[in-house]
Design a protein with these regions (language model features):
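A contiguous pocket-lining binding segment that forms or flanks enzyme active sites
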Residues: 165-177
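Extended, subdomain-level signal for the structured scaffold at the beginning of enzyme domains
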Residues: 1-168
């Protein structure tokens, strides 16, 4: 009888955590649904810039851009009618923080990304920042994550590109937890 009770409690706890934890995290402000005004910018161009750094310090642990810090702005810009390009410091495949897609952290935009072959191709084949002219974009967005701490702030090329875009009156922004 005691084993059956323990099993019932364990199953109930697992179900609560699996189904209830995401709702609780949303209630506390993690990945809330935004129900504000929807803005349209048809014909606009946005550039999302991410890290190329894939390892957390000397730990050997995989890292990169935090999923939702790249996917949420991508879909906001895309849904607003903008053309969206994706670039990284070195170009090529963008490393994504593997923990950012775990069920309790994944945002709706992350789930959308996992079903979007067009965006996935952009992430696997990102443009190299030095091959771009940032002044040709209306918005330049820097996506955060642990990897960004290793190369975004130390890239002279990124610094120059952002400086030119800002001087040209472009919108420059970013996010990092």
């Amino acid at each position: 009888m005691l084993i059956a009770l323990a099993l019932i409690i364990a199953v109930a706890l697992v179900l609560f955590l699996w189904l209830g934890l995401p709702a609780m995290l949303t209630a506390f402000g993690l990945h809330p649904a935004y129900r504000g005004a929807v803005h349209r910018f048809p014909g606009g161009r946005a550039l999302i810039v991410t890290t190329s750094h894939a390892t957390l310090g000397e730990s050997g642990k995989a890292t990169g851009v935090f999923g939702s810090e790249m996917t949420a702005p991508y879909y906001e810009f895309l849904d607003a009618g903008m053309a969206v390009d994706v670039a990284s410091i070195r170009g090529g495949a963008i490393p994504i923080e593997p923990d950012s897609f775990r069920w309790f952290l994944a945002a709706p935009s992350d789930k959308r990304y996992l079903k979007d072959p067009v965006f996935q191709t952009k992430v696997k084949n990102s443009m190299r920042i030095e091959a771009l002219d940032f002044t040709q974009y209306d918005i330049i967005f820097l996506a955060g994550g642990w990897g960004a701490a290793y190369d975004l702030g130390t890239s002279a090329v990124l610094g120059e590109q952002i400086t030119h875009a800002w001087a040209a009156g472009k919108v420059v922004g970013g996010v990092c937890h």
